[in-house]
């Protein structure tokens, strides 16, 4: 069973959580894209929802599927956010931001009454950190900010390298908000809360990809032969 099949299986399990009339945060990434396609089918069948996208890519995908959209200025409180994750541990702590949408993703998730993560089971880890942790930073003073982030990483008991993210073309990546992304390749993060606090103390940091105490549940799809087996962390 392929990775896209598992992502679709996780997304299928999340679709029944979406009720008529909901104000829905819609995530970014390949698993969220599978959810958007399924949600579009439900909308065309008569489901009434209003979505708030977490990126320009998600906005375009939702418009393509005919999903009605609004902004957080229109809907400052949401009922539910469905989004993917790059890693999730047993305490529902996440690393997100592989799609460079971490700032908007976190704003939307925190504005929601509930957040449910959808992912294939390979994203479930014992300790966060194998996936590079994205840190969104202001372009002004990026060199000084990078050095301050390095110091914060060391104080949190982590080691590794910090690399500015680039596009496939080789150009430095800019987020939808016009910021840069530093990827922290740490291997493991023994104390996510300490690292989060340290990063927040750096003035040039706009946001980081540690989502702590935000997710309510995670839907994880694993392959058993040709079958997808879906499990749930937390409570749906």
Swiss-Prot record:
Pathway of action: Carbohydrate degradation; pentose phosphate pathway; D-ribose 5-phosphate from D-ribulose 5-phosphate (non-oxidative stage): step 1/1
MF-aspect GO terms: ribose-5-phosphate isomerase activity
Gene3D superfamilies: 3.30.70.260, 3.40.50.1360
Residues annotated to bind substrate: 28-31, 83-86, 96-99, 123
Enzyme Commission identifier(s): 5.3.1.6
Catalysed reaction equations from the record: aldehydo-D-ribose 5-phosphate = D-ribulose 5-phosphate
Active site: 105
One annotated GO biological process: pentose-phosphate shunt, non-oxidative branch
CDD domains (UniProt xref): RPI_A (cd01398)
The entry's keywords: Isomerase
Pfam families according to UniProt: Rib_5-P_isom_A
InterPro entries cross-referenced by the UniProt entry: NagB/RpiA_transferase-like, Ribose-5P_isomerase, Ribose5P_isomerase_typA_subgr, Ribose5P_isomerase_type_A
Subunit structure as annotated in this protein's UniProt entry: Homodimer.
Protein function: Catalyzes the reversible conversion of ribose-5-phosphate to ribulose 5-phosphate.
Family named by the database record: Belongs to the ribose 5-phosphate isomerase family.
Name of this chain's protein: Ribose-5-phosphate isomerase A
């Amino acid at each position: 069973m392929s990775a896209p099949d598992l992502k679709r299986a996780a997304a299928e399990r999340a679709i029944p959580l979406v009720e008529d009339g909901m104000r829905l945060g819609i995530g970014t990434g390949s698993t969220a894209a599978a959810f958007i396609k399924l949600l579009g089918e439900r909308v065309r069948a008569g489901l009434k929802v209003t979505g708030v996208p977490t990126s320009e890519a998600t906005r375009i995908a939702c418009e393509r599927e005919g999903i009605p959209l609004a902004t957080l200025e229109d809907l400052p409180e949401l009922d539910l956010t469905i989004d993917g994750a790059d890693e999730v541990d047993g305490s529902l702590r996440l690393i997100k931001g592989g799609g460079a949408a971490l700032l908007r993703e976190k704003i939307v998730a925190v504005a929601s009454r509930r957040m449910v993560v959808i992912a294939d089971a390979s994203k479930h880890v014992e300790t966060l950190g194998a996936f590079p942790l994205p840190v969104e930073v202001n372009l002004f003073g990026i060199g000084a900010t990078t050095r301050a982030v390095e110091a914060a990483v060391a104080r949190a008991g982590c080691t590794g390298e910090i690399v500015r993210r680039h596009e496939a073309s080789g150009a430095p990546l800019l987020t939808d908000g016009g910021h840069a992304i530093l990827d922290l390749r740490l291997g493991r993060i023994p104390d996510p809360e300490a690292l989060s606090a340290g990063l927040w103390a750096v003035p040039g940091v706009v946001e980081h990809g540690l989502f702590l105490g935000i997710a309510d549940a995670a839907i994880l799809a694993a392959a058993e032969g040709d079958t997808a087996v879906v499990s749930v962390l937390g409570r749906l």
